[in-house]
Design a protein with these regions (language model features):
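General N-terminal leader/first-domain-start detector
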Residues: 1-15
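Extended alpha-helical interaction modules
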Residues: 21, 32-183, 187
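Elongated alpha-helical scaffolds
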Residues: 24-26
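Cytosol-facing regions at membranes
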Residues: 64-67, 209, 238, 245, ...
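Conserved helix-loop functional segments at active or binding sites
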Residues: 162, 166-169, 195, 209, ...
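Membrane-associated alpha-helical segments
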Residues: 184-310
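Alpha-helical transmembrane anchor segments
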Residues: 288-342
Length: 342
């Protein structure tokens, strides 16, 4: 019985070794079927395995068939390749052929010609070929995401240009609305960053594995044919570079949005400081006016008090004159006026 919780396992299917491996993002199945050296036909999947895979056909990332043959009596055209690529691998101990044309069921075919490899080295070399194709397909999954994101980035760039022009126009009365628009754009950019970061990171990791496995093949030319590694790199590197460029574009956009927000925040802060300074100046002017008014009121109060005192003394001296003291009110007021005024 299969242990479904294990990371990998080996069993037998129709009497043939059947290996399965669980990876982080995908699941691999490897079936080894012996065949005679004279057989030039590509083997079909056993019915049991084909029926098991059929319901999951839409989720199949990559299907590769490797046919192993000896170099003696090789007739390459019999294997149905059209303009194949070929490479000597393992320091010339084996030759690999493929035209990278998918069959009707989506299978990519490799013809592996073993010259001087033992079983262990042959297995390692075939495994590298399988990993190259698997990792290449896994890395290419991000291309659809990158294309969709690129269209969104075009719209975000236009929005950022519009907001930058509004900010440069000095529309101080609309600073709040401008800040809200920048915050909304920032949220959208951050959302796209969070959603795509894992996928872009996976693409870089898978691409690095592809190039490492290609280097481990130690390829050399077979006649005038294009090497497998050259064929793969010419078609795979643009995908990797496009994804990397899209990721960098997203990161740069996030920085530009953040910088615009910081600049606007600084401008709003300066405007608020200027408003506060104006309010303080207004308060100081009002305080000065109140001090002047208070001084004027105090001066008027002194005049009024002096006037009342003089009238009071006038009545007093008038009464004393009536009593016969010989001091008229006028003389008394003249004598008292200086100290009263002081």
């Amino acid at each position: 019985a299969l242990d479904t919780t294990a990371a990998q396992g080996i069993t037998r299917l129709d009497g043939h070794p059947f290996k399965w491996e669980r990876h982080t993002e995908f699941f691999t199945l490897t079936l080894v079927v012996p065949c005679t050296a004279a057989d030039t036909d590509w083997q079909a999947l056993p019915p049991v395995l084909a029926e098991a895979i059929a319901p999951q056909a839409a989720q199949v990332i990559n299907a590769v068939q490797v046919l192993v043959r000896d170099e003696q009596g090789l007739d390459l055209p019999q294997y149905g390749f059209k303009d194949p690529c070929g490479s000597c691998v393992g320091g010339g101990d084996a030759v690999v052929w493929s035209d990278f044309r998918l069959t009707e069921d989506g299978t990519n075919r490799f013809l592996f010609i073993n010259r001087r490899l033992n079983a262990y080295r042959q297995g390692r070399m075939i495994r590298r070929l399988l990993e190259i194709e698997t990792y290449r397909m896994m890395a290419s999954l991000t291309l659809t995401t990158a294309k969709a994101l690129s269209q969104e980035l075009d719209a975000f760039d236009k929005t950022l240009v519009t907001l930058s022009e509004r900010s440069a126009g000095g529309e101080g009365h609309d600073s709040k609305g401008l800040l809200e628009a920048i915050a909304h754009l920032s949220r959208q950019v951050v959302s796209r960053t969070v959603k795509t970061r894992h996928r872009f990171g996976a693409t870089q990791a898978y691409a690095q594995l592809v190039f490492e496995r290609l280097g481990e093949l130690r390829e050399s030319h077979v006649g005038d044919c294009q090497r497998l590694g050259v064929f793969i790199e010419r078609r795979f590197k643009p995908t990797v570079r496009y994804c990397a460029a899209t990721e960098q574009r997203l990161e740069q956009l996030a920085k530009n949005v953040a910088n615009l927000g910081d600049l606007l925040q600084a401008r709003v802060q300066v405007e608020m400081e200027e408003q506060n300074a104006g309010i303080l100046r207004s308060l100081n002017a009002r305080a000065d006016a109140q001090v002047k008014i208070q001084r004027a009121v105090e001066g008027l109060s002194i005049i009024a008090i002096t006037y009342y005192l003089l009238n009071l003394f006038k009545l007093l001296y008038g009464g004393l004159n009536v009593l016969g003291l010989g001091l008229t009110a006028r003389d008394g007021l003249l004598a008292m006026a200086p100290p009263v005024l002081l």
